[in-house]
């Protein structure tokens, strides 16, 4: 109750609705969530979970606790258990807390904002080690501790372990690529992830080049904000659009491997540099050229450059977009559109799990 939606629906401040205007009930739900469900809707798990796990730990001692969030309530559970039993604790962040892109959209009161930041600081201070999904996010967490003038005994407290891909998704068989010059985006495209310059450039190219118009196919798999569909319509790209609401994981893997280009659009928000979506690593496993639209000095751009898996272009750089799309199109026409994809194995989940085990062993050893 109190959410203005069906029980099966989730509230996402970054993507409220495909309707033109979000309903007042949805906006109220976001306000309610931000101001009363702190740090998140799982806050009511904390007390019973601490009680249950305390009973469990008394009978079954462990060497280390690892919490992963969001939801950040998981960190609050782990923090209480760490303090109660003096067990080393690693806090793993797959997304930021108060620096997440939609934080400003939660309509927080001053009290709620201060509480979020206080809890975040307590977690960062009390954890023996803090793992983040990317370099920029890790530096932001470290700055919070530095600004609070809190000294840490562990010089390597803040570590980076990215998301990754399943090695089983990397095909050893010969892939038959799409006959069309297909540009595929997999996943939700919220309003903040609308590449307006990209649609404009594609619209210009289909007007300038009849062959390009006939060859182009835009594949969007997942939920798409209405503003994006309107942009596509405005630039007369409806004939090239292939919109697919849902595919299974295996079907998505196939689409990624068969597409000529994989489109990665980062949210055009204040924290764009730190955004490292799990989707990017799945793109790496597909071994197709990645066209990333986002900051050229961001974490995603760094990995794309390191792995030679594609190109990153700033949000509004129409000239660079047109230049690189035409380069890819020329290679496509010559049947030479490939990518080097070097050093991608370091981002396999197997290797990343090995990195996590090393951090766990270090934390446990330092407490003995």
Residue ranges and their predicted role:
Residues 73-76, 80-84, 98, 110-132:
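Membrane-proximal helix-turn-helix segments that form the acceptor-binding/catalytic region
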Residues 117-157, 301:
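A short, active-site helix/loop in glycosyltransferases that binds the activated sugar's phosphate group
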Residues 128, 237-242, 256-274:
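Acidic donor-binding loop of glycosyltransferase active sites
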Residues 136, 161-164:
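Carbohydrate-associated surface elements
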Residues 209, 215-222, 227-253:
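Nucleotide-activated donor-binding/catalytic signature segment of Leloir-type glycosyltransferases, i.e.
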Residues 316-320, 333-362:
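A charged, aromatic-enriched C-terminal amphipathic alpha-helix characteristic of glycosyltransferases
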